[in-house]
Amino acid sequence: MAPDRALAAQARPEQEFFCFRVGDLRLGVPSENVLEVLRAGLLTPLPRTPSFIMGVTGHRGEVLPVLDLLRFLSKGEARIGPRTRLFVGVTGSYVAGVVADTVLGLRRIPVADILPPPLGGDAAAEHLLGVVQASGNQEAINLLNFSKLLQTARQRAVAR
């Protein structure tokens, strides 16, 4: 990298996000919250759990709860098909699988390009870190506060 480019990159801090699509939503979570991506296999439904918990699956000898972000955010319902993926997300001691229709990959986003979340009381807005606006052929990405999302999901599941 040329010295001028290196200085410009240092002057503009970036954050890396794991980006994916579920339903009509294009979402990103901080890459440090993602352990790995798996094919969505068979899920075992659990009785008397919130509707956003699709079930559990076995992963590396552990039972992994699988979350439907569309239901959690009141934006519809995810479907599991042959191309569906799960990403294993973690924050603190909480680990969960999350349904993704399409994995878009890792994206480095300049911190200055992250806009604050929109004001509003819906479930999606309260779990956002911010939004990256559309540019060129890139669509807007809603950046999730994954730590808050998993904590809220756990609280809702335990409260039932």
From Swiss-Prot:
InterPro entries cross-referenced by the UniProt entry: CheW, CheW-like_dom_sf, CheW-lke_dom
GO CC annotation terms, alphabetical: cytosol
Domain CheW-like: 14-155
Keyword Ion transport: no
Pfam families: CheW
This protein's UniProt keywords: Chemotaxis, Transducer
Keyword Cytoplasm: no
GO biological processes: chemotaxis; signal transduction
Alphabetical list of PANTHER family matching this protein: CHEMOTAXIS PROTEIN CHEW, CHEMOTAXIS SENSOR HISTIDINE KINASE-RELATED
Function according to Swiss-Prot or TrEMBL: Necessary for proper aggregation of cells to form fruiting bodies. FRZ genes define a system of signal transduction analogous to the enterobacterial chemotaxis systems.
Protein name (Swiss-Prot/TrEMBL): Protein FrzA
Organism of derivation: Myxococcus xanthus
Gene for this chain: frzA
